[in-house]
UniProtKB/Swiss-Prot annotation:
Keyword flag Endoplasmic reticulum: no
Composition bias type Basic and acidic residues, residue spans: 93-103, 114-139, 186-195
Effect of substituting Q265R: Loss of plasma membrane localization, but stays in the nucleus
Annotated membrane topology: Peripheral membrane protein
GO CC entries: nucleus; plasma membrane; pollen tube tip
The entry's keywords: Cell membrane, Coiled coil, Membrane, Nucleus
Annotated protein name in UniProt: Interactor of constitutive active ROPs 1
């Protein structure tokens, strides 16, 4: 029975190792694709730019909506950041495990060198052996060849693990880059959210000031309205007072007119009396008395009753405004004076 060679064993083991390696690579690529699909940082995220603060309610409503939108985006970014950190931690754990396995396998002796030494020893024994002992030596040699094949498979598996480790390192680098981008975006959203909150606070304070000014203006308008009502009441009162004063003025003017008429009549009477005293009283007694009686028979003087009012004076007395007593007392004094002059 011919001896199996190491190269033939290696060729028989290689397809199985390649299939396992391809399966591992496909699993690794599927894991990367799943990671890429599950992580979509910042997709369709449009952060609004902040504008100037508006004191009108519509601007405040829009600003509040933008702040709530930013807060929701910030929460989504925090959740994605947490998932990225978990993926990075898992990748680090897998990397560490692969490094440990690779380190353990690197401490084992090199199976390729052992295979080469075994092949050289087998050829040497093949040349030196007797033909009758071929079957016996073949059975003895099959055990180390199978052992070498297992070690070669382990080596190939170690190489696959090393390739996986390299791919995992690339994945970790990519996750770190995405994590850095997410942290930057999270920081930017936080700053923008803080800026919008400050603008909202400024707008709220400005609206509060405007409302305070508005309340003050309303109170001023109310006070001015009350003052205007008071002024209207005062104006109406003054108008009534002015009307009453005008009525009193008209009454006084009428009284003054009557007094002027009476004064004119008194002046005429005084002139007549002076004329009588200066001219007609120079006659002797009886003639003078008779003439005096004749003179006063018209109603100016009555020796028994005193001085009489001239015609038309009684009506003026009746029309006077409360001055009848003063007029009568004045006429009595004038009559007494006239009587004394007559006795002389």
């Amino acid at each position: 029975m011919p001896r199996p060679r190491v190269s033939e064993l290696s060729q028989r083991q290689a397809p199985r190792l390649r299939s396992s390696s391809s399966t591992s690579d496909s699993n690794h690529s599927n894991r990367l694709i799943t990671t890429d699909q599950s992580f979509k940082p910042g997709v369709d995220r449009k952060s609004p730019r902040s504008g100037g603060p508006n004191s009108d309610p519509l601007g405040q409503k829009k600003l509040g909506g933008r702040i709530s939108d930013l807060e929701s985006q910030l929460g989504q970014a925090q959740e994605e950041l947490r998932l990225l950190k978990e993926q990075l931690a898992n990748a680090e754990a897998v990397k560490k495990q692969a490094q440990d396995e690779l380190h353990k396998k690197s401490k084992k002796p090199n199976p390729l060198a052992r295979v080469e030494e075994s092949a050289t020893e087998a050829e040497r024994i093949d040349r030196d052996e007797i033909p009758g002992d071929v079957q016996k030596e073949t059975d003895v040699f099959e055990v180390p060849v199978e052992k070498i094949a297992v070690e070669e498979e382990e080596l190939r598996s170690g190489n696959d693990e090393a390739e996986k480790l390299v791919a995992k390192e690339d994945e970790i680098k990519m996750l770190k880059a995405r994590l850095y981008d997410m942290e930057k975006e999270h920081e930017s959203l936080g700053k923008e959210n803080e800026s919008l909150k400050n603008q909202l606070s400024d707008s709220a304070s400005e609206i509060s000031n405007v409302k305070a000014n508005e309340d003050e203006m309303v109170s001023k308008v109310s006070r001015i309205g009350e003052e205007l009502e008071e002024s209207r009441a005062k104006t109406a009162h003054l108008k009534e007072k002015l009307e009453s004063m005008e009525e009193a003025k008209d009454a006084l003017e009428a009284e003054m007119k009557k007094l002027r008429v009476q004064t004119e009549q008194w002046r005429k009477a005084a002139d007549a009396a002076a004329a009588v005293l200066s001219g007609e009283f120079e006659m002797n007694g009886r003639d003078r008395s008779g003439s005096t009686e004749k003179y006063y028979a018209g109603g100016f003087f009555d020796p028994s009753a005193g001085f009489m009012d001239p015609p038309g004076m009684a009506d003026d007395y009746d029309d006077g405004l409360g001055s009848g007593k003063r007029k009568s007392s004045g006429m009595k004094m004038f009559g007494e004076l006239w009587r004394k002059k007559g006795q002389k």
